[in-house]
Curated annotation (Swiss-Prot):
Its main location: cytoplasm. It holds the Pfam family Alpha-amylase. This is Glucan 1,6-alpha-glucosidase. Coiled coil: none annotated. Keywords: Cytoplasm, Glycosidase, Hydrolase. It comes from Streptococcus pneumoniae serotype 4 (strain ATCC BAA-334 / TIGR4). The keyword Aminoacyl-tRNA synthetase does not apply. Belongs to the glycosyl hydrolase 13 family. It comes from the Bacteria. The record marks D313 as: Transition state stabilizer. The gene is dexB.
């Protein structure tokens, strides 16, 4: 395998609406991001994954795109975008664009024309049927919406304002590749591909994910756009197994650099239930089993994985699986140390590096997220008590990740001089960037050190992974390459745990505790975590 820059990269996800507001309108924007590049350079990241900034009516916070080659006015202008790319490049940071090509907005010119004129070429860019089948939208209700003008139904697996594209149409595919090349020519560093495993769907056969044409489409895309360029491409693939991940990310297959797989995230939900039926407690044995499978079965020669706990759709890791009260700092560091030394490309979501937490939502009028609001409406109709609904939204709702970035202890956490589009977490006076940078023992410096360890130990790209047999609540593994061995240990609980590991410590690389020189028969305090090099 030829080693690429992204094997050793660490990517930072920016959710633009909530990162930094430069003009006081309460919404984060591109100049705001540019103004914080020095902070991100200090963290040490290699690339920024930018959630969508394209022109959009914002029905789903920008994942409903009206024009792929224009910037939404709330985020700024194309000049602002060009400046962000250029300023990031000066700091050796690449910009990864979010590519949403499973669907568009219903306000995209293609869909407007498709509705106006049933004989237009654009009509076939979307999926129309005379009668709907029983496919459901991921955002609740039917996946089919009736269009009165033409008397047909169009398919939308997300909101009805997000009609699905018909990838069987070759002309549409060429239009998408032209748009991708427009961004590549601007100097971006790659693409994160939203729900890309859905583009091969066959709705009449109820095939939604991993349809038979998915991989041929991706190979065609690769060859028409980024294939001969040194770009990072990552596909959002909810249903992927290690075997499926190889189809996407084996360099010989000429598709993508890596995948986002979500098997570990599935442990947040009760099996066979909608996401709102969340698991009260993390099944650590299952977590170890899942990571062990991905670390050992997706080898460096035949594929590549992403490493993440958080993104814009998920609750804060320190709140759902950590302890965001008594052990907030320690549990946040434990999850970071555990993840960042595995094989794969780590992703940090904005605010994760300072230990931002879920928001204490109390009423529905505090909620902005379309998915949460649709769930609440349907649940209320079914007679589910509002207390139960709010509990689910507090724990698992997407707005938890979307509250504004907490920069300092000034009004609105320094995010905006205006009224923020979504309320700032009331804990911002204690949890903010200014506080983190001033404290040498903060979560921020743990992340900074982890980024540095990866840069200085490129052998970790290829190193073997060995899961160790430990107490149930302890996750421990060894990364090994030739004579070099790193031992990583994390106690994922609020209780003390016993640990016995054979071997002698050569040096301590990182810790959130006082790492013991002697590994045999030690007692781990709650949320203890460390990485040591073994002799």
């Amino acid at each position: 395998m030829q080693e690429k820059w992204w094997h050793n990269a660490v990517v930072y996800q920016v959710y633009p609406k909530s990162f930094m507001d430069s003009n006081g309108d309460g919404v984060g924007d591109l100049p705001g991001i540019t103004s914080k590049l020095d902070y991100l350079a200090k963290l040490g990241i290699t690339a920024i994954w930018l959630s969508p900034v394209y022109d959009s009516p914002m029905d789903d916070n920008g994942y409903d795109i009206a024009d792929y080659q224009a910037i939404a006015a709330i985020f700024g202008t194309m000049e602002d975008m060009d400046q962000l790319i250029a300023e990031a490049k000066k700091r050796d940071i690449r910009i990864i664009m979010d590519l949403v090509v499973n669907h568009t907005s219903d306000e995209h010119a293609w869909f407007v024309e498709a509705c106006e004129n049933t004989d237009s070429p654009e009509r076939d860019y979307y999926i129309w049927r005379d009668e709907p089948n029983d496919l459901d939208s991921i955002f609740s209700g039917s996946a089919w919406e009736y269009d009165e003008k033409s008397g047909q139904y169009y398919l939308h697996f997300f909101s009805k304002k997000q009609p699905d594209l018909n990838w069987e149409n070759e002309k549409l595919r060429q239009k998408i590749y032209e748009m991708m090349n427009f961004w590549i020519d601007k100097g971006i560093g790659g693409f994160r591909m939203d729900v890309i495993d859905m583009i091969g769907k066959i709705p009449d056969e109820k095939v939604v994910n991993n349809g038979p044409m998915l991989h041929p489409y991706l190979k065609e895309m690769n060859q028409a756009t980024f294939g001969d360029k040194d770009l990072l491409t990552v596909g959002e693939t909810w249903g992927a197994t290690p075997e499926i991940a190889k189809f996407y990310s084996d360099p010989k297959g000429q598709e993508l650099s890596m995948v986002f797989q979500f098997e570990h995230i599935g442990l947040q939900y009760q099996e066979g239930q909608p996401k709102w039926h969340y698991q009260k407690e993390l099944n650590i044995a299952k977590l170890k089993e899942i990571f062990n499978k991905w670390q050992t079965e997706l080898g460096v020669e035949d594929g590549w994985n992403s490493l993440f706990w958080n993104n814009h759709d998920l609750p804060r890791i320190v709140s759902i699986w950590g302890n965001d009260q008594e052990y907030r700092e320690k549990s946040a560091k434990a999850f970071a140390i555990l993840l960042h030394l595995m094989r794969g490309t780590p992703y940090i979501y904005q605010g994760e590096e300072i230990g931002m937490t879920n928001y204490p939502f109390e009423t529905l009028d505090q909620v902005e997220d379309i998915e949460s609001l649709n769930y609440a409406r349907e649940a209320l109709e079914k007679g589910v008590p509002i207390e139960e609904i709010m509990d689910s939204i507090r724990v698992i709702g997407r707005d938890n990740a979307r509250t504004p970035m907490q920069w300092d202890e000034s009004k609105n956490a320094g995010f905006s001089t205006g009224q923020p589009w979504l309320a700032v977490n009331p804990n911002y006076e204690m949890i903010n960037v200014q506080e983190a940078l001033a404290n040498p023992d903060s979560i921020f410096y743990t992340y900074q050190k982890l980024v540095q360890i990866r840069k200085e130990n490129s052998w970790l790209v290829r190193a073997d992974f060995e899961l160790l047999d430990t107490a149930d609540k302890v996750f421990a593994y060894i990364r090994k390459d030739g004579d070099r061995r790193f031992l990583v240990v994390a106690n994922l609980s609020n209780e003390e745990q016993d640990l016995t590991v054979e071997g002698k410590v050569k040096s301590v690389l990182i810790e959130n505790t006082a790492a013991k020189e002697v590994l045999e028969k030690q007692v781990l305090a709650p949320w203890d975590a460390f990485c040591v090099e073994l002799l």
